[in-house]
Amino acid sequence: MQVIRLEALSDNYIFLLYDDKRNIAAVVDPAEAQPVLKKLAELKADLVAIFNTHHHNDHVGGNKQLIEKFPQLIVYGGAEDRGRIPGQKVFLQQGDRVEFADRIAEVIFVPGHTRAHIAYYFPPQEASETGDLFCGDTLFSGGCGRLFEGTPTQMVDSLSKLRSLPDNTRIWCAHEYTLKNLQFALTVDGDNADLQRRFNEVKAYRSRGEATIPSLLGVEKHTNPFLRWDQASLQSTVKSSDGVQTFARIREMKNNF
């Protein structure tokens, strides 16, 4: 399975999953249809599935046009998003599985950004390979999504699920927010040498117009403050010994950054 990153809107990424054996594709969170249709035409491939992580328009905006072009495709989304995702036919819950290109993705229920948010995790097929996590707006490179419908407790639980995955998991999040996220991270975790190094690397990438997605989960664990709510240095910064409260205070600081 090949993952093809497509740019959309101002800072969105759409991920096209391509099965070159069968010349078919699936797409994760099509913010708009045109970039997907253009790449499918180049590949001369059929689209068989849409994997939506949540209902926000910058993740489902292309659904209707893609369904019109490929009426047999199947739209997957979270069970609690029923009625909110255009064309949804499959309603997924924690622990469900979906198959594409001889790989099986595990569905992880990750409420917080929205009440129905899910992520798709494709474990590696071989020990030497990477897994692939399509996490929408739950976990970002260097950050996490705002809490529009969920609570800090829910988000910490959701991020705990993602944090437990292997370090070599590739993080395919839906926005190019890394540089600004790390600028904020330095304000709450400025003595973190790993974070300082990463910020300089990302700054160089973006100066060359290069994407920072995918990230690796192992890197996130050491540099993303929203996965480090139980670290003493961050708890000291926000003056709390409680993990959820630490997360909530950091999230509020980021909202106002």
From Swiss-Prot:
List the SMART domains: Lactamase_B (SM00849)
Q: Which reaction does it catalyse?
A: an S-(2-hydroxyacyl)glutathione + H2O = a 2-hydroxy carboxylate + glutathione + H(+)
Q: In which pathway does it act?
A: Secondary metabolite metabolism; methylglyoxal degradation; (R)-lactate from methylglyoxal: step 2/2
Keywords per UniProt? Hydrolase, Metal-binding, Zinc
Enumerate the residues binding Zn(2+) 1.
H54, H56, H113, D137
**Molecular function (Gene Ontology), one example:** metal ion binding
GO BP field: methylglyoxal catabolic process to D-lactate via S-lactoyl-glutathione
Question: How and how many cofactors are bound, per the record note?
Answer: Binds 2 Zn(2+) ions per subunit.
Cofactor(s) named in the record: Zn(2+)
The residues that the entry says bind Zn(2+) 2 are: D58, H59, D137, H175
Q: What does this protein do?
A: Thiolesterase that catalyzes the hydrolysis of S-D-lactoyl-glutathione to form glutathione and D-lactic acid.
Q: How does it assemble?
A: Monomer.
Q: What is this protein called?
A: Hydroxyacylglutathione hydrolase
Q: Which gene encodes it?
A: gloB
